[in-house]
Amino acid sequence: MSKQDGKLTGLFGAPVSDRENSMTAGQRGPLLMQDVYYLEQISHFDREVIPERRMHAKGSGAFGTFTVTNDITQYTNAKIFSEVGKQTEMFARFSTVSGERGAADLERDIRGFALKFYTEDGNWDLVGNNTPVFFFRDPKLFISLNRAVKRDPRTNMRSAQNNWDFWTGLPEALHQVTILMSDRGMPKGFRNMHGFGSHTYSMYNDKGERVWVKYHFRTQQGIENYTDEEAAKIVGMDRDSSQRDLYNAIENGDYPKWKMYIQVMTEEQAKNHPDNPFDLTKVWYKKDYPLIEVGEFELNRNPENYFLDVEQAAFTPTNIVPGLDYSPDKMLQGRLFSYGDAQRYRLGVNHWQIPVNQPKGVGVENLCPFSRDGQMRFLDNNQGGGPHYYPNNQGIYESQPEHKKPPFPTDGDGYEYNYRQDDDNYFEQPGKLFRLQSEDAKERIFTNTANAMDGVSKDVKVRHIRHCYKADPEYGKGVAKALGIDINQIDLETNQDETYENFK
């Protein structure tokens, strides 16, 4: 019997005689335990919801193609970039960050921008956002961010107080907060926003020469954003507006595109950089490190099944290929373990076998992993009956020394270094970003901030005003006015670290 016949079967192939009526002892009697189809269905239903992502739970995705448009082989020998015109299959997932699976798409929030490239040397995952920076630069704070932006443990409601108490306790968060309160904190849809690798990564070439890089993805649909008022009206009619926009565009053949660029910094330049080049709260200025075009990706195929391809998509920055590498960015280093560990919890130890996660560029038949067994291991015959140890006399599991990476530069002793003693320049870049805004855009930052801080205690509001003022006096004055606070009553000369010391 073929699936096309539409005839109902159980999970193991037996035909189902009655889909609507349970087996009972008599016309009006109780259920019988031998109604195995009912038991099979209800027990499966009880388990069909898998754990949601701790962050980025609400998302949309699509398949597409990446095409190289410019030669960057002087920086990397990664095969994905080996020649102009080369194409690589890929998958992209966009998301909000704070909300749960059922949250509205139009919330003032960061958007996730995760890409999976199926290269011939394995999967390369670039797990980014629609902003080039983040709230902090040490992964030990990540759990607190998650809790602060999600539901309060007592009320089970989102808490602006918790959110802003955390953000304003970290002066380095102002750069990200400024972006979030700007027009770009509410993109019209996933098609109308830029993407960033955010972290500093590295590339190396055939000579073993390493450079530090940042990835940028510029939307070719143009940047479009909503005001808070516009977004509120749309949410009242459609909570899935961004997902619907992406899906419908692809279904209608209006395939969205993004151009990929990199910024490149040499190891010598990094040593002389005025700030820590691996600080996730700061950008590299484009006048010093201009954008270099790399390629373009186009999303041209919607998933056939959302759960199969989008909900079960697993991204981790440890999925990297020869020619590409990490950096000393502490936030990136912290994610190297966390992401894969979360996927093993959410999807199981063999989640690499799920179709969207398979290394399609290599081919499952060509894999030779040392890992075996675990729940639901089936795809590669569990490596068959060959040796499951190394070394062995069959030459299985031999290393590939030709893919050794060049030495990773490090210095110093292992210690819990206070990064604030190394760099307390929290406000220069937020100030420059503010001054780049038009007068109307500045007013919207003030208004958006006031909206977002509704219900927040005055001391937390004052903390934020003080930080804004240190970035630019007009920034602080504008936020104070929008919040209805007399800035002349605020001690603006308080040491910039005082709030953090109190926060600890």
Curated annotation (Swiss-Prot):
Residues involved in heme binding: Y339
GO biological process: hydrogen peroxide catabolic process; response to hydrogen peroxide
Stretches that traverse the bilayer: none
This protein's record includes keyword Metal-binding: yes
SMART domains to which the protein is assigned, alphabetical: Catalase
A Pfam family annotated for this UniProt entry: Catalase-rel
Record-linked PROSITE patterns: CATALASE_1, CATALASE_2, CATALASE_3
Family: Belongs to the catalase family.
Protein name (database record): Catalase
Originating gene: katA
